């Protein structure tokens, strides 16, 4: 049997983060998608029986695409210019469907892969190029990005086997969702959760 890496808390303060500080980033969100809601419900019993996991409600379900920077380090003028560039570039892309799931255990999360990767990578490239239209240096690496959606975040250290067993007992669940927009959000993690206000939604096509 393959040994699973132990769980650890996701909520350590990464460099630059603190209470009251927020971050501009591009995400795909799913609050209006019935299939995403069903998927959250399908896995809800697993999270309910595991207090070491903080569940992500549908409202805050997201696929992280591309960061810009902390809001106190990025001018509103640059934000506006990046949005305008993103609107132009995303107009050349078409909406598409992706499949989320099934869920698996990760050291800090229960997460679900999102496939196919290619259309998502095209959206991310458009966003990166839009940032590059405004700034000389685009933050974050172009390579190594794995599109995923997290269902819950670990809040403590401990063995991963009980989490994996609970997921296995629940069975594999997936959802097909439509991606027709990408959102620039103002993200915070003040309350041991990722919460945000939307700055602008940019449509594809």
Protein language model features and the residues they cover:
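Histidine-dependent nucleotide/RNA phosphoesterase domain, centered on the 2H-phosphoesterase fold
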Residues: 1-205
């Amino acid at each position: 049997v393959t040994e699973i890496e132990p769980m650890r808390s996701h909520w350590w303060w990464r460099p630059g983060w603190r209470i009251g500080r927020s971050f501009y980033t591009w995400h795909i969100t799913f609050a209006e998608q019935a299939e995403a809601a069903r998927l959250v419900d399908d896995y809800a019993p697993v999270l309910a029986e595991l207090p070491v996991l903080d569940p992500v409600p549908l409202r805050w379900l997201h696929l992280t695409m591309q960061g810009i920077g902390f809001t106190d380090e990025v001018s509103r003028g640059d934000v506006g210019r990046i949005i305008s560039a993103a609107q132009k570039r995303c107009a050349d892309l078409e909406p598409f469907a992706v499949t989320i799931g099934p869920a698996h255990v990760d050291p800090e999360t229960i997460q679900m892969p999102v496939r196919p990767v290619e259309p998502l990578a095209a959206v991310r490239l458009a966003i990166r190029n839009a940032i590059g239209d405004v700034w000389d240096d685009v933050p974050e690496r172009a390579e190594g990005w794995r599109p995923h959606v997290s269902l819950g975040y670990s809040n403590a250290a401990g063995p991963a086997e009980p989490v994996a067993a609970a997921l296995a007992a629940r069975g594999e669940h997936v959802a097909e969702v439509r991606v027709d927009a990408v959102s620039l959000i103002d993200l915070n993690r003040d309350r041991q959760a990722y919460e945000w206000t939307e700055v602008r939604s940019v449509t594809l096509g």
